[in-house]
Amino acid sequence: MDAEAEVVHPVGIEMVHRTRPEDAFPRNWVRLGRDRFAVEAVLPHDHPFFAPVGDDLHDPLLVAEAMRQAAMLAFHAGYGIPLGYHFLLTELDYVCHPEHLGVGGEPTEIGLEVFCSDLKWRAGLPAQGRVGWAVHRGDRLAATGVAATRFSTPKAYRRMRGDVPVEGISLPETAPVPASPAGRARVEDVVLSGTGREGVWELRVDTRHPTLFQRPNDHVPGMLLLEAARQAACLVAGPAGIVPVEARTRFHRYSEFGSPCWIGAVVQPGADEDTVTVRVTGHQDGETVFSTVLSGPRAHG
């Protein structure tokens, strides 16, 4: 293996756009082919934000975040995309196999195979493309995923964003919904506020959150939108909540600071009473920010 092709944590945490080692999950990588990479990662068992869910399972959103980080690592280290470029997801789908995601009181080593395809190049670097993942725990397939992504130079990104402040600051002015019905143990992780309307909440953004905001950002991160979707799904699913082992998400535009973003959730009809499917959408200033369909077993009972 080419020594220059290996990035080992914690030296490479900037490669996954994290500033705190505890929030960076890949440990090393190796190229398997022109557009295929193997990434070794560790899922923590005691992460304060990505805590175990349901019957002591790794949070599917933790798995999705490990996928996202593995893709960023592959594009930076494997294709030479410079740090400082913007990594923009427009689609993100995943399927987790919960029987292989038990926590068991200790960190879990996983292997992620990253496949890149449909790459469009500009100035010798990928400008957009698709990425797929196969996540293994030992010899067991624990999850799969696919996404569509774009990359932007800092200059092009600022031109696209116009006069939006480089570093947005948002402190919540509304009370959070109760933590437990939203699928959270800590109130500081709740990202929804009540509106008095059934099935509709206001996105609650706190740029002081150590995991959701680790560096200056000019818009609400996609990770926070996915968390809002999960919490809304738990609230409409009822007291048992939901473990979102499957998700199909489309990001349509940025969610901006300083304007309310409304999160709506509706349970979808289904023949399987043991599985809950919820459609969640986010709207801001009359436009759709994102839409997602989450499916999974009830978290309790």
UniProtKB/Swiss-Prot annotation:
It catalyses: a medium-chain 3-oxoacyl-[ACP] + dihydroxyacetone phosphate = a (4-alkanoyl-5-oxo-2,5-dihydrofuran-3-yl)methyl phosphate + holo-[ACP] + H2O. Its EC number is 2.3.1.277. Disulfide bonds: none annotated. The keyword Transferase applies. Keywords: Plasmid, Transferase. It holds the Pfam family AfsA. One of its GO terms (molecular function) is transferase activity. InterPro entries: AfsA-like, AfsA_hotdog_dom, HotDog_dom_sf. It comes from the Bacteria. Involved in the biosynthesis of A factor (2-isocapryloyl-3R-hydroxymethyl-gamma-butyrolactone), a gamma-butyrolactone autoregulator that triggers secondary metabolism and morphogenesis in Streptomyces. Catalyzes beta-ketoacyl transfer from 8-methyl-3-oxononanoyl-acyl carrier protein (ACP) to the hydroxyl group of dihydroxyacetone phosphate (DHAP), thus producing an 8-methyl-3-oxononanoyl-DHAP ester. Belongs to the AfsA family. This is 2-oxo-3-(phosphooxy)propyl 3-oxoalkanoate synthase. It comes from Streptomyces griseus.
